């Protein structure tokens, strides 16, 4: 305990710099988390709007997920899915 109390009392330039840097990092992360929350709410609103306009939200989410994938990866996934569906007599 004495060492942590001594560290708190250490007001050297290096310690002050580290404390300021840590504080800055924490504040940046907090600000980004707030922005992320706002963006998530905006995305939720867009999905609600699209649903109100008659679009299938589940299909939209699937399209968004597929567009993020590498085209080769997506094609492989679709091929495997088709193979499994054929094996199960679904197509």
UniProtKB/Swiss-Prot annotation:
<dbReference type="GO" id="GO:0003677">
    <property type="term" value="F:DNA binding"/>
</dbReference>
<dbReference type="InterPro" id="IPR046367">
    <property type="entry name" value="GapR-like_DNA-bd"/>
</dbReference>
<protein>
    <recommendedName>
        <fullName>UPF0335 protein BRADO1188</fullName>
    </recommendedName>
</protein>
<comment type="similarity">
    <text>Belongs to the UPF0335 family.</text>
</comment>
<dbReference type="Pfam" id="PF10073">
    <property type="entry name" value="GapR_DNA-bd"/>
</dbReference>
<dbReference type="InterPro" id="IPR018753">
    <property type="entry name" value="GapR-like"/>
</dbReference>
């Amino acid at each position: 305990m004495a060492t942590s109390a001594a560290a708190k009392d250490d007001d050297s330039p290096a310690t002050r710099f580290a404390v300021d840097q840590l504080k800055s990092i924490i504040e940046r992360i907090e600000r980004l988390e707030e922005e992320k929350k706002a963006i998530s709410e905006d995305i939720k609103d867009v999905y609600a709007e699209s649903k109100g306009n008659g679009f299938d939200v589940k299909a939209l989410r699937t399209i968004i997920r597929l567009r993020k994938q590498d085209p080769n990866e997506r094609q492989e996934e679709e091929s495997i899915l088709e193979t499994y569906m054929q094996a199960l007599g679904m197509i």
